[in-house]
Amino acid sequence: MPKQLMIYEDAVPISTERHGEWSVKTGADYSYARGLNSVPLLAAEFIPAATEFAIIFAGEGDSIFPSVILGMRDGENSFVGEDNAWQGKYVPAFLRRYPFVFSRSEDGGTFTLCIDEEFNGFNQEGKGERLFDSEGARTQYLENVLKFTREYQAQFNRTMQFANRLRELELLEAAQARFQLPDGQSAALAGFQTINRDKLKALPGETLAEMARTDELELCYVHLQSLNNLTPMAQRQTAAARTTEAAEPAPEKPAGKKK
């Protein structure tokens, strides 16, 4: 399952000295997400994401964090089309934040805004939005990026608290999803956890009431409901695989000898 920097190849701190003349052109190209079959999801995203994604919990111990499943097999994302466009209704904030990310100091007290210099849209030809103006000041674009990244980090911390709460209440259990491949073979997606509905319902009334007040209880049931998306997602990926196979030209037959 994913790490927080899994799509960043060369994230470096943004500075006027290094990036004063650089611009960023973003758009509908999600090729950087093609090989991701899951990405982290913030608690604030549960409701919009649950309409089409299955929300699960990845990681172990105090690193457990919610994620959305994007593909039923490693290295496959069924929401990135052949034209690299996003084919879903909702784009997770983890992907919308790219190519920017915060790096944290060793003491955890300072965050520095970084950019992945390997991003295809990072250029010195003036394409897209500049990071700094002619006087070396942040552009409005960079200010907006900084605001979004700060909000993301704040929501990340809140989501981590929610995940830790579930772990402390021992509500999570290992799970797997089974599905059929185009060739008729069965396969399974494992290595993630889900909430045990019976354990959730068996919590003391005071605990459930507290979770209801903090919206944690709603998040739990949104997660459980989202698991119904596993079957249509498997069907989506199977249909895409069959379409790809049908589009591939058949191998040419060897030429026979002339009589």
Segments from the language model and where they lie:
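Short, extreme N-terminal leader segments that mark the start of a protein/domain
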Residues: 1-70
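A contiguous, surface-oriented mixed alpha/beta subdomain in the mid-to-C-terminal portion of proteins
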Residues: 102, 106-259
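Short linear motifs in intrinsically disordered
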Residues: 43-48, 91-93, 167-171
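Residue-level signal for pocket-adjacent positions within structured domains
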Residues: 64, 74-75, 195, 206
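Short, basic/low-complexity N-terminal boundary segments at the transition from targeting/disordered tails
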Residues: 30-34, 75-84, 155-162
